[in-house]
Amino acid sequence: MCIRDRKASYLFVDIAHKVAAYQEAHPEKEIIRLGIGDVTQPLAKCVVDAMHDAVTEMGTKEGFHGYGPEQGYPFLKQAIQGYYAGRGTQLAEDEIFISDGAKSDLANVLGLFDVDNTVLVPDPVYPTYVDDNVTDGRKIIYSRTSQENGFLGMPDDSVKADIIYICSPNNPTGAAYTREQLKAWVDYAKKNNAVILYDAAYECFITDHALARSIFEVEGARECAIEICSFSKIAGFTGTRCGYTVVPKELE
């Protein structure tokens, strides 16, 4: 099959095509979009001012500095350290890796894993998890969720997985794990020598103190988990492309 003969299979692209076709056929209809997690307000003034200052600095001979540190600027890493420390979670600066967004990290981190690994993915969830692994040829197993289990899948000892995806709060259901529930997943991962890829993009919306905002609030998680987060939601940053990944030193 030629590449030009292939049809788009990314969920959001398919939905966009259907929405465009519907709008063309029904221009009088107003569509409420509950798909991609975009924001509805402009960038905060402090963000815009900081960007202006950075561009101005780079436009001077004295201020131009070219490429930044490959793992991210220390001032941003230190701010992330402080953000986690405010919730009682300690991170080392060299455990934090700044990137161009969580979506990129979710794909790039898979370069650390073999293509014959088995991947456990909750259903429903952010479709990128499946797309990235199918592209690499990995086997996908689904952890089914429903209203009966609060849309929160729990470990099944009869299932063996090497890579475990957890999104909490979940996209799209909004369901979030307690620390006790996440401890069950940590124990399962350690038992199976698996790695949890924890998507914390929506952690800032958690207000219930019984719910974990980081998997590193759970004992043992530093030995089996990688946490990926985005500024898109906490800072209204969609389209600006900035996020980070936390890889603990204990993870082998």
Predicted regions located by residue number:
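Conserved small/polar residues in nucleotide/adenosyl-binding loops
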Residues: 1-5
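Short catalytic/ligand-binding loop motif for oxyanion handling, primarily in non-cytosolic enzymes
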Residues: 40-44, 172-175, 204-205, 236-237
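Walker B catalytic acidic pair
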Residues: 200
